[in-house]
């Protein structure tokens, strides 16, 4: 096929993990011949006896697995799915309508590597896993990034950026207006009365029911006594 090219086989400089001779390559059901499969850290390559072959970049490989299902293929093999077109079908002309229909369809090619020694399949699969792990999907990395607003350091140094201001509790109090402080004191008083009322309900309040109680801001209680207010609706 036209996409087969001549190139030197991967070596130690490419991080060669496994070299499997007598391996047949099949692309989308069409046999490419028998050659040597090279599983290296940099790429996956296959070369036939004449030195012609192809290489696959790991970021384009979406799936690899050992297939032992005779209904899928008569021989056990290493299955590799690639998000790209290869061979003559990659050069087929498309009409405008075909191009529109294919905009949302990602190209896919299926490779099958069939070694004469089927016992080598596990080693081939393991080498593929190790090399694939060295090339994580960029989209997966982007999804782990923080998606909030970014602080532009350069803009700030030039006096063009705004820095969000954060205060501690004490610093926040110092920035309150007189009206704001009065409102805060009123809210704290209401909270204190609410907590006091809650723990004097039914005339029961024990030292064990309170770990800390300072200005009505931090309270921890023991579980409700069985039979008392278990069916009460409480708005928080």
UniProtKB/Swiss-Prot annotation:
Sequence intervals crossing the membrane: none
Pfam families: Voldacs (PF03517)
MF terms (GO), sorted A to Z: intracellularly calcium-gated chloride channel activity; lipid binding; potassium channel activity; small molecule binding; splicing factor binding
Main location: cytoplasm
Location(s) in or outside the cell: Cytoplasm, Cytosol; Nucleus; Cytoplasm, Cytoskeleton
Role this protein plays: Involved in both the assembly of spliceosomal snRNPs and the methylation of Sm proteins. Chaperone that regulates the assembly of spliceosomal U1, U2, U4 and U5 small nuclear ribonucleoproteins (snRNPs), the building blocks of the spliceosome, and thereby plays an important role in the splicing of cellular pre-mRNAs. Most spliceosomal snRNPs contain a common set of Sm proteins SNRPB, SNRPD1, SNRPD2, SNRPD3, SNRPE, SNRPF and SNRPG that assemble in a heptameric protein ring on the Sm site of the small nuclear RNA to form the core snRNP (Sm core).
Known partners and oligomeric status: Component of the methylosome, a 20S complex containing at least PRMT5/SKB1, WDR77/MEP50 and CLNS1A/pICln. May mediate SNRPD1 and SNRPD3 methylation. Forms a 6S pICln-Sm complex composed of CLNS1A/pICln, SNRPD1, SNRPD2, SNRPE, SNRPF and SNRPG; ring-like structure where CLNS1A/pICln mimics additional Sm proteins and which is unable to assemble into the core snRNP. Interacts with LSM10 and LSM11.
Alphabetical list of PANTHER family matching this protein: CHLORIDE CONDUCTANCE REGULATORY PROTEIN ICLN, METHYLOSOME SUBUNIT PICLN
Name of this protein: Methylosome subunit pICln
Organism from which the protein derives: Rattus norvegicus
Gene giving rise to this polypeptide: Clns1a
